[in-house]
């Protein structure tokens, strides 16, 4: 198992966001996390990549509030819950946040170089850049354009490309289709499949259930911070109550 999350609990003050949650992801899998808004999907990604622990320190310093984390996150046999977020990145576990969030005042190519800040050898950086350009030709065409002027679809390509620049082993991608037109959503999902085909493991949070079930090897359904179902898209769609109550289908 490449990634194992065991009995994870996250509380913001007294609000329980994740409750005794456990999941696993095998190497080179594409696994999705689906469920209603507020189920805890994005919090799970942030906990895996060390951002909840970082938020805990910021919250304590700024407001005196508390964020409680329990449970374990293990990646390639090493405990990620015991090391800070920047060390988690060095292990090859990358978070690609929702709403894309490029450095808006920087050019496309400078955004991409920012994603490669851990790589010391210039040749590796250039090799990665060429691979990103092969996957996303539009980024090469827009390389000197300020990223804040890109379309929503182009910004999503940039977010994925920036994450790929660090040579990740596992990418946690949070709602990549949010706010995109249907034709752009289709294009983004095609690119996500291409990334998986490169041998990169993917853990994907997505609201577009009908599409993600077609491309994911397995899916976890979350509700109120708990896993309530797991299986292939075909298996989950056979459950009428699950389909109507939790998946909105």
Q: Could you say what each language-model-derived stretch is?
A:
Residues 2-249:
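Glycine-rich phosphate-binding loops of nucleotide-dependent enzymes
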